[in-house]
């Protein structure tokens, strides 16, 4: 390793490394720039390494392709070298057979007076002419000339004629392209640059890059130029000397004076060697040279093998030869080479010379004499094997060097004619002193030969015009400084303004967009100057009549009173934007990099306080960036454009990009959000996608001459300074933004950027004026915000109860945004919507809205181009609405808002086809006597399983002495110990205030929960009005169901019918039941379930509410959702027929479901009831009951109780809402009943769930399976069946308790679904389940039960809360005492008669008077 490289590797300090990287980057940047002109093409890595040996630097990022890129770059490298040699001479120069576009390669410009002469369209055409007839072409006027890549197509006579007819020409640099290896018919020495093809007559084809379309045909005699040292024509002679070589490109100098040539011309280094001739005749020897490495390897191999054969030699030769080289080899010569090695191996390698070690003088003299005699006789008698081997084992070196020779210029194209007479030069059309136009020269030359001029550079005129316009712009900017004003806020600009401006000159007339018609003469606003009016007209604001906002007249344009001095930009790539900015009177200001701001951002990124993509970069890169930000001394050229949303800040920029495509390659657009990036991509479709970037990716990728930062106020503080440090090649920054809108928010108070001003506040003083006008919003909306508007139509302000599906939704927080995105809504935050334009915008108001700043509200309210819809998801209480007064824009917007009603349509369901009867099957007999044995063996004894309480001892759940019966827990109401454990497990107490506080805290989330529910259940978006008729029918049905009880049941609840029974008191009992669930049979005993009893009048009210909401739900429930409520098993079976069993299904249970129905779900119930028009009085009464329910112990926490009217329906609705909030359900088939659910797809969890899951006390126990269970039914591809194991165990329990005759009728109905399947049960049951199924069938048949009809009976659990559905006759004596006659024409909501009752609390104070109908 060299000394400097060793020191560089020892650098460890980050600051030192950063400085070293800065130096390395500068060299890298200089290297990249140096490749733009002569070496711009893309090549592979191996070719790049070979080109570097020729002094050619390549750009690894280049995407410019060429059919023979390497050869073209070697040609340009040759011209670069000629250009260096031309610098030692005084111009101008003459270029022969030269394209004007190549002047830059030799370091010459278009305006330096050089002469260009083209005798033919292509240099190879000259080989067809006998002589160069220069009588009809301009002569060479200059002493020094360049003949470009043409010499190899000329004869010595033609070159001599060129000098003879141009006496002013003294020195000619001639480049030629000839491969020296063609002299020996060898393959290309530079296959990455060119390939060769040889012909039988000795000629060859030269193909650059292996591309035949660009190839040249050469005769063998052209190769003589490689050894040309002098040309003689009579007494006239020329001296030639080879100067340099780059691949097959060579530079020769040709002069009139005699200069001795070099002894040898060196062309290429090679390791080729030739072998000695050892066979006779001569053509049996090896003909071609081979690499010395190959010869030595083969020789050593042959010497290392004991008895080498010809086959061994061929095998080894193939092994050491690359496949790519085989195409260049001749098999005949390879055979000769193999025989050469075979012969060599046959000779002895043992030294047969005598040894001189240990001999005396006489002995040495005798040996010396004998060896001399052998050497003399060797030509006659031959050498020994060793001496023969040593004579040819060392191959002869092969060289490409040539000895210069002298050529005599013959007549015509021949090279070997003797010297002939030389004719005197014909008179030329112009004297040597006549000036020549470098652009006319080649044209005259080609016209003389009848060839069109296709070699002129067509871009010269464009470049000349561009440079002229650039000079005009720079002169215009330097005339006088522009005086402008800082744009004040609109509320500060109510009065007239008198800004000082510079009147535009006649040289700069105002322009309008090309695609816009010429505007009519505008009506001048009295406070605007002529320049202001012209600027607004250029932005398509023609109606400048005075418009009024909240604070008075609105001024469309505010100027900056500060004096700004513009700077000059000479970069030609920025010229179109400089022209555009000048037309809009926007100065370009030079400003030094603010190292403090740049360092603050770099430090925060390095410490992972800001950003996501940047923080993942290597620490070395981050430290280097930080160090560079602290020491940079760059100057920024900044143009700042401020204006309201829709004012046309970016219009002129986009027009420049559309109309001047050359700017696309040199422009980068940086946006703060992905939405804004997509917006730019749609408006500039021709711009490459990688030129439009978000701000973090832009920081990591290369910059361009012009960088546009749109909505730069949303970029982190210090971004522009940091970006400039990383991209010193940027010449112009164009910033667009609005200081009235939101800026980037740094949330970490420990971050360095937390204490910095925003980017828009930092660069606001550099802004010339503020455009306070918009094309986006109608005047109805824009004037409220203090903005002038050109749009007169539209501007509706609406209010909705639910968020529309297809609307663009704006919410105050990111958490709410994530939740709505999971609902497939296009949601953005108030602050994050900056840059958005939408026709209709929906703004959600919740408890976070009053916390938003004026800038945030202005941003949200200025997005709509047609209408704004407000959705209040939080509260309509006066207190909350008063808080909205803090946002003056919002307060004004909400004036005049109205609601619209919508009535959903009822669509009847289609009848489903019936299934054909199935064939009967027979099952083998199973031994059911052993079915209970595994459970009995693993079950512990009775005392261990029972629960123990200190007050009442142990529970009594294990009944009888039968071990089989003891497997099933028997919960009894009289078991006090079990009641105590049940109360501990199922009941939670609280206070009324705590319940109300919980209700208040969960209000916001409940609204979102309803949105999830409504989206899945297809709830109509508009609120539904109250339906008095439906309410009356629901009340009548509740009363009718209550009166269907037996007399004993009604009399048993007489105390709950007492008016003095407290409205909010709940009597708790223990539910008596046998527990038969499979997961609980034989397991440790657990707490039971409670039964709650409310006052009968409360039950009637809540049951009416449940039936009313159930009817409303049935009107919109989608077909893919099945709720097991008032449904038969046949209906459920038909629903399952379309179930997808080919994928994972999902079922779920919950932990303490009733106990987890807290304030969040109560708010959800209230929100849903409110949407369906339930009177507020009913909702207040329901809220009072739920938040102040009393038991003998204390006030209950908000939870679900079994005695409520809506228990089943509310449990089902909350189950659906929870499932929809957690998973992306869409159109999945699902069935729900209380806390039970099953779906035919395992849906993905929503991304927003992680933000809200901690707010749910409800905990699910999901199960992914291919055999889902629901409400005791197993769902299969052939329909629903009862679990045969559970069904058999339940029947066995009834048999052992002697109650089988009471349960067989209902069990037979459940059993029939599996029994009717016949042979199909083999497809759905496991071996164990088949055994239980057979045992059940046999037990049924033994009892004489042969089920034929099943599935038409209603389940008894669809209203489990008040247990009103009993198959008993009503009491005749009680029926006439209550009138149930709903009114024929129900009065409106306000006129419905209500029965009054008072809800009491222990201190006898009424909560409130509530009316019920």
Swiss-Prot record:
Swiss-Prot/TrEMBL catalytic activity: ATP + H2O = ADP + phosphate + H(+); RNA(n) + a ribonucleoside 5'-triphosphate = RNA(n+1) + diphosphate
Family under the similarity heading: Belongs to the potexviruses/carlaviruses RNA replication protein family.
Coiled-coil residue windows: none
GO biological process assignments: DNA-templated transcription; mRNA modification; RNA processing; viral RNA genome replication
Gene Ontology molecular function: any one: mRNA methyltransferase activity
Bias (Low complexity): 499-515
Function noted in UniProt: RNA replication. The central part of this protein possibly functions as an ATP-binding helicase.
Domain spans labelled Alphavirus-like MT: 59-226
CDD domains cross-referenced by the UniProt entry: Alphaflexiviridae_RdRp (cd23246), SF1_C_RecD (cd18809)
Domain (+)RNA virus helicase C-terminal stretches: 772-905
The entry's keywords: ATP-binding, Helicase, Hydrolase, Multifunctional enzyme, Nucleotide-binding, Nucleotidyltransferase, RNA-directed RNA polymerase, Transferase, Viral RNA replication
Protein EC: 2.7.7.48, 3.6.4.13
UniProt feature, compositional bias: Pro residues: 421-432
Record keyword Nucleotidyltransferase present: yes
Domain spans labelled RdRp catalytic: 1143-1249
Domain (+)RNA virus helicase ATP-binding: 614-771
Protein name per Swiss-Prot or TrEMBL: RNA replication protein
Chain positions recorded as ATP binding sites: 643-650
Region of interest: Disordered: 413-444, 472-525
């Amino acid at each position: 390793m060299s000394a400097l490289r060793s020191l560089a590797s020892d650098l460890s300090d980050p600051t030192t490394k950063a400085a070293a990287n800065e130096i390395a980057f500068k060299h890298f940047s200089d290297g990249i720039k140096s490749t733009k002109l002569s070496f711009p093409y893309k090549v592979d890595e191996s070719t790049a390494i070979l080109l570097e040996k020729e002094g050619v630097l390549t750009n690894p990022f280049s995407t410019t392709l060429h059919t023979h890129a390497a050869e073209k770059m070697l040609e340009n490298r040759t011209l670069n070298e000629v250009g260096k040699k031309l610098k030692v001479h005084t111009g101008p120069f003459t270029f022969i057979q030269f394209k004007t576009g190549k002047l830059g390669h030799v370091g010459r410009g278009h305006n330096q007076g050089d002469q260009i002469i083209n005798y033919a369209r292509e240099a190879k055409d000259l080989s067809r002419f006998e002589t160069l007839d220069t009588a009809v072409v301009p002569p060479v006027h200059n002493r020094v000339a360049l003949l470009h890549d043409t010499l190899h197509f000329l004869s010595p006579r033609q070159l001599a004629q060129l000098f003879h007819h141009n006496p002013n020409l003294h020195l000619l640099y001639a480049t030629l392209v000839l491969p020296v290896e063609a002299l020996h018919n060898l393959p290309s020495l530079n296959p990455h640059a060119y390939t060769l093809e040889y012909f039988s007559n000795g000629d060859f084809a030269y193909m650059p890059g292996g591309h035949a379309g660009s190839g040249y045909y050469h005769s063998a005699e052209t190769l003589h130029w490689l050894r040309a040292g002098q040309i003689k024509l009579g007494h006239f002679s020329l001296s030639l000397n080879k100067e340099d070589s780059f691949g097959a490109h060579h530079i020769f100098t040709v002069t009139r004076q005699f200069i001795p040539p070099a002894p040898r011309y060196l062309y290429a280094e090679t390791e080729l060697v030739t072998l000695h001739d050892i066979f006779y005749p001569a053509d049996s020897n090896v003909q071609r040279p081979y690499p010395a490495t190959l010869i030595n390897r083969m020789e050593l191999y042959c010497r290392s093998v004991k008895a080498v054969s010809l086959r061994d030699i061929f095998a080894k030769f193939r092994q050491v030869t690359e496949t790519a080289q085989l195409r260049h080899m001749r098999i005949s010569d390879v055979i000769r080479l193999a025989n050469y090695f075979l012969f060599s191996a046959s000779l002895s390698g043992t030294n047969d010379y005598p040894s001189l070690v240990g001999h005396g003088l006489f002995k040495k003299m005798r040996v010396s004499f004998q060896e001399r005699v052998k050497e003399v006789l060797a030509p006659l008698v031959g050498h020994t094997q060793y001496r023969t081997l040593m004579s040819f084992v060392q191959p002869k070196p092969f060289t490409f060097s040539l000895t210069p020779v002298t050529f005599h210029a013959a007549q015509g194209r021949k090279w070997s004619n003797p010297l002939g007479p030389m004719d005197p030069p014909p008179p030329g059309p112009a004297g040597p002193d006549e000036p020549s136009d470098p652009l006319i020269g080649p044209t005259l030359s080609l016209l003389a030969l009848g060839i069109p001029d296709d070699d002129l550079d067509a871009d010269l005129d464009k470049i000349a015009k561009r440079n002229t316009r650039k000079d005009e712009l720079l002169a215009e900017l330097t005339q006088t400084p522009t005086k402008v004003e800082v744009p004040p806020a609109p509320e500060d600009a109510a009065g007239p303004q008198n800004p000082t401006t510079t009147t535009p000159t006649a040289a700069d007339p105002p322009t309008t967009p090309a695609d816009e018609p010429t505007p009519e003469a505008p009506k001048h606003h009295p406070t605007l100057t002529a320049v202001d009016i012209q600027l607004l007209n250029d932005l398509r604001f023609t109606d400048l009549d005075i418009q009024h906002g909240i604070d008075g007249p609105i001024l469309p344009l505010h100027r900056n009173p500060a004096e700004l001095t513009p700077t000059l930009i000479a970069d030609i790539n920025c010229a179109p934007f400089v022209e555009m900015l000048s037309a809009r009177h926007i100065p370009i200001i030079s400003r030094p990099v603010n190292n403090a701001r740049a360092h603050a951002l770099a430090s925060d990124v390095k410490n992972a306080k800001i950003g996501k993509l940047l923080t993942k970069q290597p620490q070395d890169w981050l430290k280097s960036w930080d160090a560079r930000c602290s020491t940079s001394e760059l100057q920024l050229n900044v143009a700042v454009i401020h204006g309201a949303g829709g004012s046309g800040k970016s219009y002129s920029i986009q027009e420049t990009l559309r109309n001047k495509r050359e700017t696309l390659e040199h422009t980068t657009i940086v946006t703060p959000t992905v939405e804004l990036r997509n917006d730019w991509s749609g408006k500039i479709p021709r711009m490459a996608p990688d030129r439009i970037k978000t701000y973090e990716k832009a920081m990591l990728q290369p910059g361009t001459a012009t960088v546009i930062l749109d909505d730069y106020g949303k970029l982190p503080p210090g971004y522009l300074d940091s970006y400039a440090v990383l991209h010193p090649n940027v010449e112009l920054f164009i910033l667009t933004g609005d200081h009235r809108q939101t800026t980037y928010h740094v949330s970490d108070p420990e971050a360095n950027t937390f204490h910095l001003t925003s980017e828009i506040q930092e660069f606001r003083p550099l802004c010339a004026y503020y455009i306070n006008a918009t094309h986006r919003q109608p005047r109805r909306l824009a004037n409220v915000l203090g903005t002038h508007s050109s749009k007169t139509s539209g501007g509706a302000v609406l209010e909705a109860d639910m968020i529309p599906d297809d609307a663009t939704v704006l919410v105050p927080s990111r958490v709410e945004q994530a939740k709505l995105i999971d609902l497939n809504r296009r949601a953005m935050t108030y602050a994050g919507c900056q840059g958005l334009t939408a026709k209709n915008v929906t703004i959600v108001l919740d408890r976070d809205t009053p916390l938003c700043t004026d800038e945030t509200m202005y941003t949200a309210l200025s997005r709509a181009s047609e209408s704004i819809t407000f959705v209040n998801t939080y509260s309509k209480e006066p207190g909350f609405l008063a808080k909205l007064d803090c946002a003056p824009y919002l307060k004004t917007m909400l004036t005049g808002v109205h609601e619209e009603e919508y009535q959903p349509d009822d669509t009847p369901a289609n009848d489903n086809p019936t299934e054909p009867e199935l064939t009967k099957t027979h099952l083998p007999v199973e031994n059911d006597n052993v079915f209970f044995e595994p459970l009995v063996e693993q079950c512990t004894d009775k005392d261990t399983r029972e629960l123990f309480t200190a007050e009442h001892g142990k529970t009594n759940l294990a009944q009888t002495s039968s071990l089989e019966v003891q497997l099933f827990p028997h919960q009894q109401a009289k078991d006090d110990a079990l009641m105590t454990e049940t109360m501990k497990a199922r009941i939670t107490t609280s206070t009324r205030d705590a319940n109300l506080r919980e209700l208040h805290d969960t209000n916001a989330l409940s609204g979102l929960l309803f949105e999830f529910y409504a989206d899945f259940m297809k709830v109509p978006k508009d609120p539904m009005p109250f339906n008095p008729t439906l309410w009356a029918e629901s009340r009548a049905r509740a009363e009718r169901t209550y009166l269907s009880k037996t007399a004993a049941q009604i009399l048993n609840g007489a105390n709950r019918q007492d008016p003095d029974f407290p409205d909010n008191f709940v009597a708790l009992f223990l539910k008596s039941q046998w527990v038969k669930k499979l997961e609980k049979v034989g397991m440790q005993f657990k707490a039971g379930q409670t039964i709650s009893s409310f006052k009968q009048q409360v039950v009637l009210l809540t049951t009416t509410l449940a039936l009313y909401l159930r009817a409303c739900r049935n009107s919109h429930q989608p077909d893919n959702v099945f709720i097991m409520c008032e449904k038969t098993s046949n209906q459920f079976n038909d629903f399952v027929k379309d179930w997808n069993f080919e994928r994972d299904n999902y079922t779920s249970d919950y932990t303490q479901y009733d106990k987890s129905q807290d304030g969040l779900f109560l708010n959800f119930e209230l929100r849903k009831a409110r949407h369906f028009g339930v009177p507020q009085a009913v909702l207040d009464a329901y809220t009072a009951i739920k938040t102040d329910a009393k038991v003998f112990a204390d006030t209950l926490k908000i939870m679900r109780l079994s005695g409520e009217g809506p228990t089943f329906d509310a449990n089902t609705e909350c189950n659906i809402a929870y499932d929809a909030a957690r998973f992306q359900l869409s159109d999945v088939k699902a069935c729900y009943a209380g806390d039970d659910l099953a779906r035919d797809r395992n849906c993905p969890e929503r991304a927003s769930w992680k933000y809200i899951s901690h707010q749910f006390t409800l905990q699910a126990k999901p199960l992914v399976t291919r055999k889902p269970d629901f409400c005791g039914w197993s769902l299969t591809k052939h329909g629903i069946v009862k679990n045969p194991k559970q069904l058999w165990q339940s029947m066995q329990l009834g048999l052992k308790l002697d109650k089988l005759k009471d349960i067989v009728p209902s069990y037979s109905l459940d059993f029939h679904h599996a029994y009717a399947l016949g042979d199909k049960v083999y497809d759905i049951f496991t071996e164990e389940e088949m055994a239980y199924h057979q045992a059940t069938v046999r037990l049924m048949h033994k009892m004489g039960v042969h089920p034929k009809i099943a599935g038409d009976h209603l389940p008894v659990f669809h209203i489990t809360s008040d247990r009103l559905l009993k198959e008993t006759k009503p009491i005749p004596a009680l029926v006439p005492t209550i009138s149930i006659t709903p009114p024929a024409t129900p009065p409106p909501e306000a006129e419905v008669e209500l029965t009054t009752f008072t809800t009491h609390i222990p201190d006898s104070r009424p909560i409130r008077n509530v009316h019920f109908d």
